[in-house]
Amino acid sequence: MQYAIAGWPVAGCPSESLLERITRKLRDGWKRLIDILNQPGVPKNGSNTYGYPD
């Protein structure tokens, strides 16, 4: 009989360490930030003067 406790690895399934989770989330976050900054276009702030009054 095989028991699995919530949050614990099951036999045959490798568990991910906390360091691996942290670094994966950091990499994903940096990739998302780069994608956001690389988007073309003009920021929308309700004016075409880039935040300066006319």
From Swiss-Prot:
Q: Which domain of life is it from?
A: Viruses
Q: Which Pfam families match?
A: Lambda_CIII
Q: Which PROSITE patterns match?
A: LAMBDA_PHAGE_CIII (PS00553)
Keywords (alphabetical) are: Activator, Viral latency, Viral latency initiation and maintenance
Q: What InterPro entries does the record tag this protein with?
A: Phage_lambda_CIII
Q: What is the protein's known function?
A: Acts as a host protease inhibitor that allows the virus to initiate latency. Following infection, prevents protein cII degradation by inhibiting host protease FtsH (cII is a factor that initiates the expression of repressor cI, the major component promoting latency). Functions as a competitive inhibitor (and thus as alternative substrate) of host FtsH and thereby prevents binding of cII substrate. In turn, stabilization of cII transcriptional activator allows protein cI expression and thus initiation of latency.
Family assignment from sequence similarity: Belongs to the lambda phage cIII protein family.
The name this protein goes by in its record: Protease inhibitor III
Per the UniProt record, the source organism is Escherichia phage lambda (Bacteriophage lambda)
